[in-house]
Amino acid sequence: MSYSRQYLRFPSRILGREMEMLHFGHQGYPLICLPTSNGRFFDLEDRGIIASLSHHLEQGYLQAFCVETLDWETFFNRKLELPQRRDQWLLLEQHWVEELIPYVRDEAQNDFLVVAGFSLGATHAVNLTCRHPGLVRRCLALGGPYDVAALGSITGWDPKQAEQELYFINPLAYMSNMSRQLWDQLGGRNTDLKLLTAHHDHCLSDNLRLSEVLNRNGIPHQLEVWEGDHDWPTWQAQIRAFA
């Protein structure tokens, strides 16, 4: 390995704790990496995603920041009622926008921010990108489910209630009402949004549906459907190709 690896901790006033991350590379644009559901900041290294980016890291094209998503405190926290889970996620998003992203940009000394998410991490990446157009310059969403209200089988919430309570963090819902004019006005004109899925990905239909919504509303994006599955080998190949 000829690229640097750092374990970092930094205080979050918003969350009231220290947050952990891994930082790989020495120069290039910052790539924030969001793990799969209930994943940890070290999972993407363990699963070969960082190794897949070795050439990019060695050549100084990018720096990867693997961070926490705290799914067990938000979407999967069955001790909380649905509105409380939503509010916990919104608090996490506030941390990303106001603390994490400025910290990462400062560490990388580069403002061209790219976010990559895997499975539920892709849902977070799309939410961060689409709820804050212009903040993220490129979004790589790999194998994500985008109908958040329909995740009741793994989260325990009622889909009907979730349709109302989670509207503003449910990409398939709120992007249905996002016009191209509003998208551009909010800063999305220069956003490069890529939906990356595979023929045997169980989230394929959500990717097709979201792409259809974006096409209908004239919002630029790229949909890639590869041979493969909802699995690490597919994501390793895709992140290598598009990062």
Q: Each predicted region: which residue ranges?
A:
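Non-catalytic cap/lid and distal C-terminal segments of serine-dependent acyl enzymes
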Residues: M1-A243
